[in-house]
Amino acid sequence: VGFKAGVKDYKLTYYTPEYETKHTDILAAFRVTPQPGVPPEEAGAAVAAESSTGTWTTVWTDGLTNLDRYKGRCYHIEPVAGEESQFIAYVAYPLDLFEEGSVTNMLTSIVGNVFGFKALRSLRLEDLRIPVAYAKTFQGPPHGIQVEGDKLNKYGRPLLGCTIKPKLGLSAKNYGRAVYECLRGGLDFTKDDENVNSQPFMRWRDRFVFCAEAIYKAQAETGEIKGHYLNATAGTCEEMMKRAVFARELGVPIIMHDYLTGGFTANTSLAHYCRDNGLLLHIHRAMHAVIDRQKNHGMHFRVLAKALRMSGGDHIHAGTVVGKLEGERDITLGFVDLLRDDYIEKDRSPGIYFSQDWVSLAGVLPVASGGIHVWHMPALTEIFGDDSVLQFGGGTLGHPWGNAPGAVANRVALEACVQARNEGRDLAREGNEIIREASKWSPELAAACEVWKEIKFEFPAMDTL
């Protein structure tokens, strides 16, 4: 076959509607908005080509490989209801295109280059199907839901957390004091804010030492296991590992990482260290909204959540449905299931485009955090269930009597909701009543109820189905 130079349509090679997907293929669903005049088949094929083996012109070296074996294929196109110029393109990638155990390589291939493509007005990766063969090359979460419950000896209820505020400006000693008060009052965890790393007003080593002291003091006084998410995120991987090692030497149960700003390579290294050394790993998703908030361009958070489960983390922030940050109920529940369950059935109503089998990859606890307070407790308990972490920053530290009473109020509200649920009451309908009853015998809860009775964050969600 002679080499024929020149430019040819992508769809001739990369649009293959008759293709039967293999169980080893990585499948992707893209929401494509082409430029005017670009037909859907060509746009879908262009996405498949540019994110796999293709380039803009025929190249001589194509003859040296078996393209049929390695090319991505656009195998199905479906219209988007209510959007004229938009459609979902399904692309299948052969497994051999990806390095084993590397989320970094997977994302570089699938979303690395194609989003700047001129023939498209916008492009959004809605979902990925990770084949079992690829999932098995990842360690996944350091410990997972089951082991975490056993390590903490806490069962049958959501865990309670609190982000220490003001997030920047406290000295290490005062920071540790706030940690102690919250844990002593009844919380399971406190948390470094995502941007607390090692700043001039509080260097990381001082913070780690004072927080460890707070943890041990609170444990001794309450007889419960306590933790503080020590943020190990740093400017270099070496510095990050140094912080993780120091945390292990202090004997604390859990550390934390900002996985998107820190990067997947750093995150996976840290997750491996955590498993090898018995540390739990809390993951914060700082920067996610830059990537996932626009409906037409970027990546849906469910893809970032899947990537995190592969890279490794025991907790991850997943929206609240009821607080101050973005998160529609169905969509949020869609990726909460995706984080916790072994097998998720394809279901388009919460936006699940593919069935996903995680085989034996451990589950991740979803964390609800952001603008939530005691009045939200019944809804949160009902929406997230026992395998979750509910995090109240201002909702603890904003209590009129101080941090410890704020923690007491949250713990009482939670225990009341769990008890009511276990007695068969309907949390969605009777939620306010349950909180009111509990506040009769808890002055701390009564004071919290009074402060936050009118607070709501109500704006329409940006990302709808």
Curated annotation (Swiss-Prot):
Substrate binds at N113, T163, K167, R285, H317, S369. It catalyses: 2 (2R)-3-phosphoglycerate + 2 H(+) = D-ribulose 1,5-bisphosphate + CO2 + H2O; D-ribulose 1,5-bisphosphate + O2 = 2-phosphoglycolate + (2R)-3-phosphoglycerate + 2 H(+). PROSITE patterns: RUBISCO_LARGE (PS00157). It is found in: Plastid, Chloroplast. Binds 1 Mg(2+) ion per subunit. The disulfide bond which can form in the large chain dimeric partners within the hexadecamer appears to be associated with oxidative stress and protein turnover. The modification N6-carboxylysine is found at K191. Gene3D superfamilies: Ribulose bisphosphate carboxylase, large subunit, C-terminal domain, RuBisCO large subunit, N-terminal domain. Transmembrane segments: none annotated. One of its GO terms (molecular function) is monooxygenase activity. The active site is at K165, H284. Its cofactor is Mg(2+). GO terms for biological process: photorespiration; reductive pentose-phosphate cycle. NCBIfam families: PRK04208.1. RuBisCO catalyzes two reactions: the carboxylation of D-ribulose 1,5-bisphosphate, the primary event in carbon dioxide fixation, as well as the oxidative fragmentation of the pentose substrate in the photorespiration process. Both reactions occur simultaneously and in competition at the same active site. Heterohexadecamer of 8 large chains and 8 small chains; disulfide-linked. The disulfide link is formed within the large subunit homodimers. HAMAP family: RuBisCO_L_type1. This is Ribulose bisphosphate carboxylase large chain.
